[in-house]
Amino acid sequence: HLMYTNKDGVAVSGPDSEGFSPTESYRRAVRTLFSEMGNNKEMIFYRLDNAAGTMQYDRMPNRSGNTTNYRGGSLLGATQEMVDAYFMSNGESPISGYSADGVTPIINEKSDYVEEGVSTAEYKGIDGTLYAPVGTRMMYVNREPRFYADITFSNSKWFEGTEGGYIVDFTYSGSCGKEQGSNDYTSTGYLVRKCMDSGDRNQNLVCVLLRLTNIYFDYIEALAHVSPTHEDIWTYMNMIRKRAGIPG
């Protein structure tokens, strides 16, 4: 079955359980330490003890003051188009496309997406996890849980733990910015966080090659081709969306 945990990685029975964390459930289903995978019944095919230091280096901020194993290269930058592709918390897409210039977004009015300004209150997940502190650009507030598991943006919070729990600052003179980073800084203003572990960058990780969600998606796609009105399409799609904290 799909993996459901609270914010500490402790298994819960489902998405309606007290303490359920869509962000942590999704993050741990994708990749983490083997010692933290005991609750993951979703894995079908995987590799143990993968030397993932380079992958984690690419995804970890180059934060001034952190020691080597907790300081990355800020190399794998997510694009704005990738960021725009994530839903809002209400399940709506923030934009419906781009204007003729290919850059200016066309705001989806049903999404409650706000492009300009900064937040005046903390934005937290249903499990109490801080997603966006005060002063975060509004375009990163009120997004779906997977966004906060997959994307590191300026003013986002890095994982708790040794040399963690800090607020990421990608501005030019910020703690993770270009001035102190020399060549190791994000060129897009974002980092990919997906598949990143919460510990140091030299830990060996489980590489999940096939998980139950992939099987569900393959089943959904097959039905869409041969029986597009089959009720299982939305049964399994909504199962996946609910685990991710997205309305069905």
Residue ranges and their predicted role:
Residues 1-80, 86-248:
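Acidic/polar-rich alpha-helix caps and helix-coil junctions
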